[in-house]
């Protein structure tokens, strides 16, 4: 297991989360002069993205994230994204949050599987950050935060060997190995089978630095080529045009990690059979996790670096629906297995007083306070924002 995997996992999943939220917010946009108080506008969309990106790329948070450390469970990471998604005026209910996380994880899993070389997972990360910068081009302060993260990625990962990147890729694949959630977009494009497994292509560019398959060279004991044999590989491969840029700015060449929701095609984000395809999640929820204390320590370090700005004034939150209709969202909530509901685990950690206080402070921010019900569709049940740390 690589101790350099966590930043790549977090940044790429975060990028996919922002793509999905941006697409759904755009789909629900109403011109500002025509919008009611309970409807989304372009100003609201930009505010939500700015708030989430600013929180995600907070300097202290990034410092903790880039420290060498093991990956933790899906549940621990999901908790971070759930708080991150609610770092602004937006509200997602449990069914929509489930769907959002499913789409994030399956999209990045697909990208990792299709990376031509293990090192190219870094290009995928750069593609995510390049697109994120497009969301905040009018916010120079936040743009500087993202650029600083890009510099950190270049410094830390630029000198890693091919073997180290292979270990990172294997660590990511192990993390995703039990996730086979069907996504209609992938099913439509025939890149995913009905069992939730992805289809690996037998065409397209080969990895940079390699040759198109179809030729076997034979050498003697002196290293001299003595024979060539051609064979049919059954695919339609072509040489790679050029290597993607690993610099702060440049042509990444690789398209994996770009915003697949921005193309002109019907974006269907329906997740099929999520209640059946989360067996590993169910097991984690039924049985108390023996690493729960370590996961909370991990969250304390990560979340301790997050600075969440409280909304000023009694402003209602905006409800965002990740489903096509409210009825579909309600149905997903009803069919959600009870085992996936969060349960409170009491942990005695008295040996480290400072860490105990830190955990208590962080977990206190996870508490949800009662909000008065509003008649607006985007203002009810707003999750309480985490206090600024």
Swiss-Prot record:
A cellular component term from Gene Ontology for this protein is: plasma membrane
- The question of whether Cytoplasm is a record keyword is answered with no
- Pfam families, sorted: Oscp1
Q: Name one GO molecular function term.
A: transmembrane transporter activity
Report the main location listed first in the record.
membrane
Q: Where does this protein reside within or beyond the cell?
A: Basal cell membrane
Q: Which domain of life is it from?
A: Eukaryota
Name any Gene Ontology BP term. xenobiotic detoxification by transmembrane export across the plasma membrane
Q: Is Acyltransferase one of the keywords UniProt gives this record?
A: no
Keywords from the UniProt entry = Cell membrane, Membrane, Transport
Tissue range of expression? Expressed predominantly in testis, also found in placenta and to a lesser extent in thymus and small intestine; abundantly expressed in tumor-derived cell lines. Ubiquitously expressed.
PANTHER family assigned: OXIDORED-NITRO DOMAIN-CONTAINING PROTEIN (PTHR21439), PROTEIN OSCP1 (PTHR21439:SF0)
Name the job this protein performs.
May be involved in drug clearance in the placenta.
Q: What else is known?
A: May be involved in the development and/or progression of nosopharyngeal carcinoma.
- Put simply, this protein is called Protein OSCP1
Q: Which organism is it from?
A: Homo sapiens
